[in-house]
Curated annotation (Swiss-Prot):
Protein name per its UniProtKB record: Probable ATP-binding protein YheS
Keywords: ATP-binding, Nucleotide-binding, Repeat
Family per similarity comment: Belongs to the ABC transporter superfamily. ABCF family. YheS subfamily.
InterPro entries, per database record: AAA+_ATPase, ABC_tran_Xtn, ABC_transporter-like_ATP-bd, ABC_transporter-like_CS, ABCF_EF3_subfamily, P-loop_NTPase
Gene (UniProt): yheS
Binding site for ATP 1: 34-41
Region annotation Disordered: where it falls in the sequence: 525-563
Domain ABC transporter: 2-246, 313-531
């Protein structure tokens, strides 16, 4: 049992918790939720014993094994699977003892250690690690590649696999779905449902929380508020609680009335039975929980587009990929897709199948290798992808960005608009380089929404966003009148905002006749088929020499095609190492206590400014590196 007793916790001068108490029972699975900055990660630090409370206590059994996801992954030469196995610290300790016992030829010690390894189920550790990696999206070949060969997002998956492999009584997961695609999210959800220990989970993905947790701890007003049930149950309970506060009643009714009008309109035009039924349930649920978000700090909406050409986009027999001429690598082939006003499409498919490639083709970032992509005259594009965050001017403010976009607006009008995205007061004048990932994402969305797009392309728009902002974005998209294409691992957003799904697989883009539950079944079938094919391949020796020759030829061709991109990645890695060394040097200097004496004020100020600049440069290079790695992954899987 975990007992928080009269807990008080500060971050700097900010009071996070004050006399807060709560209890988590053994083997209970708890969702820890609350607004950004409320103290969720600090509570994790308390549980990991990295932080001490200002007052009160946190108690749990001293013999509990605690596992969590490391945030750093060094560029190691060891294989992915060996790195994951290092997560089982007791296994590694016993292996080291066994090596020493073998060196001494100590038969008694060897026998004793083998017995301890047997208790740990050590002989299956390779297969268990491989199973975790497969579930998180690694191919069999990738499990033996060195850790340093993977991009930042994939290294975070390795850290997650490490934490899952480690035997634990208490598992702490802070936003584990952040670097995952939908397939891996679904797999992780199933794994956590089966987990036998106590779980405390921070997540902004309500559809991920629901099947897993049986209790919610909500940090609000410096207290730990306990709710029994899953996240959906918490929303209803909190909505009921807030509805009893009469001062909010009128706002709640306006919100409910607004959603009801949309539901009525959707009923009148729903055509695709399965998807329509699924979306209707989702929208009706949004109406039910609307009062829980009446205090949401985000209040923006999409204004009607100035024009709605029909069709907006026509794609005929187009192929898409990377490179030019003979060196081009085709990712998608013979795409046929028409987007009209009111099209609401969610893209499904495994990681590397080409979902982002299709979005880039629609956005004009990629030119079709063959076929045609025709945008109508008057298309106003709104395009959100993670690399769009880097188009922001680091030294300029949110106010500056908006004034550049809307010079005819007064400063107060711009401030009011930015306020609907929770940029208030002095925040609008702060340089973007000081913003968190979530704040940058909000600013990019603010710029997009202002332009009244009639074609909206969203590639993982909820990364970095908290639950309130995700809810606000979902509500805004419900009312959006243009054409929408979205890639997201947030199933709540998909259920509420799209009316049809397209499946991207085997170089094809095809309509998927079903809902997200049907997609989960399709994934399970695909995974079973893949495993069977591997088994058949192992047993089939016919023409093996010819097959190996053909495989070597293809590998050589692919190496040649990807050589420029690999060179770029190597150069970016060198830059990353350079900036990391610079940052480490600065932080070593900042650790010197004498630096904070009054006479060193000028030096301290210069070092802090330098730290900000180097961090920004490192972030920019890492983002560019991850984009290049994604392109390489898609080329390798083509």
């Amino acid at each position: 049992m975990i007992i928080f007793s009269n807990l008080s916790l500060k971050r700097g001068q900010t009071e996070l918790l004050e006399n807060a108490s709560a209890t988590i029972n053994p083997k209970q699975k708890v969702g820890l939720v609350g607004k950004n900055g409320c103290g969720k990660s600090s509570l994790f630090a308390l549980l990991k014993k990295e932080l001490m409370p200002e007052g009160g206590e946190v108690n749990y059994p001293a013999n509990w094994r605690v596992s969590w996801v490391n945030q750093e992954t060094p560029a190691l030469d060891i294989s992915a699977i060996d790195y994951v196995i290092q997560g089982d610290r007791e296994y590694c300790r016993l292996q080291q003892k066994l090596e020493r016992a073998n060196e001494r030829n100590d038969g008694n010690a060897i026998a004793r250690i083998h017995g301890q390894l047997e208790t740990l189920d050590a002989w299956t550790i390779q297969s268990r690690a491989a199973s975790l990696l497969h579930g998180l999206g690694f191919s069999q070949e990738e499990t033996i590649q060195p850790v340093k060969a993977f991009s930042g997002g994939w290294r975070m998956r390795l850290n997650l696999a490490q934490a899952l492999l480690c035997p634990s009584d208490l598992l702490l997961l802070d936003e584990p779905t952040n670097h995952l695609d939908l397939d891996a999210v679904i797999w992780l959800e199933r794994w956590l449902v089966q987990y036998q220990g106590t779980l405390v989970l921070i997540s902004h993905d309500r559809d991920f929380l629901d099947p897993i947790v049986t209790k919610i701890l909500h940090i609000e007003n410096q207290k730990l508020n306990e709710y029994t049930g899953d996240y959906s149950s918490f929303e209803v309970q909190r909505a009921t609680k807030l509805a009893q506060q009469t001062a909010m009643y009128r706002q709640q009714q306006q919100k409910i009335s607004h959603l009801q009008k949309y539901i009525d309109r959707f009923k009148a035009k729903a055509t695709k039975a399965k998807q329509a039924q699924s979306r209707m349930k989702a929208l009706e649920r949004m109406e039910l929980i609307a009062p829980a978000y009446v205090d949401n700090p985000f209040t923006f909406e999409f204004r009607p587009p100035q024009s709605l050409p029909n069709p907006l986009v026509m794609i005929e027999q187009a192929s898409a990929g990377y490179g030019i001429g003979e060196s081009a690598v085709e990712i998608l082939s013979k795409i046929k897709l028409n987007l009209v006003p009111g099209s609401r499409i969610g893209l499904l498919g495994k990681n590397g199948a080409g979902k982002s490639t299709l979005i880039k083709l629609l956005a004009g970032e990629l030119t079709a290798l063959s076929g045609t992509v025709q945008l109508a005259k008057g298309v106003q594009l709104g395009y959100f992808a993670q690399h769009q965050l880097d188009t922001l001017r680091a030294d300029e403010s949110a106010l500056w960005h908006m004034q550049k976009l809307a010079p005819e607006q007064t400063e107060q009008q711009v401030r009011d608009y930015l306020g609907s995205f929770a940029f208030h007061g002095d925040k609008v004048n702060q340089a973007v380089k000081s913003f968190s990932g979530g704040e940058k994402a909000r600013l990019v969305l603010a710029l997009i929404v202002w332009q009244r797009p009639n074609l909206l392309l969203l590639d993982e728009p909820t990364n970095h966003l908290d639950l309130d902002m995700r809810q606000a974005l979902t509500e805004a998209l419900v009312d959006y009148e243009g054409s929408l294409v979205v890639v997201s691992h947030d199933r709540h957003l998909l259920r509420n905002t799209v009316e049809e799904f397209y499946l991207v697989h085997d170089k094809k883009v095809e309509e998927f006749k079903g809902d997200l539950e049907d997609y989960q079944k399709w994934l399970s079938e695909q995974n079973s088929t893949s495993e069977n094919k591997v088994s058949e391949k192992v047993g089939d020796n016919e023409n093996s020499v010819q097959n190996r020759k053909e495989q070597k030829r293809r590998e050589a061709e692919l190496r040649q095609q990807t050589a420029p991109l690999r060179k770029k990645i190597t150069q970016l890695e060198e830059k990353m190492n350079k900036f990391s060394s610079e940052l480490a040097n600065i932080e070593n200097q900042l650790a010197d206590t004498e630096l904070y004496n009054a006479e060193n004020k000028e030096k301290l100020t210069a070092l802090l400014a330098q730290q900000v600049d180097v961090k920004k440069a490192l972030d920019d290079v890492e983002t560019e590196w991850m984009t290049a790695q994604e392109e390489l992954e898609e080329m390798l899987q083509a």
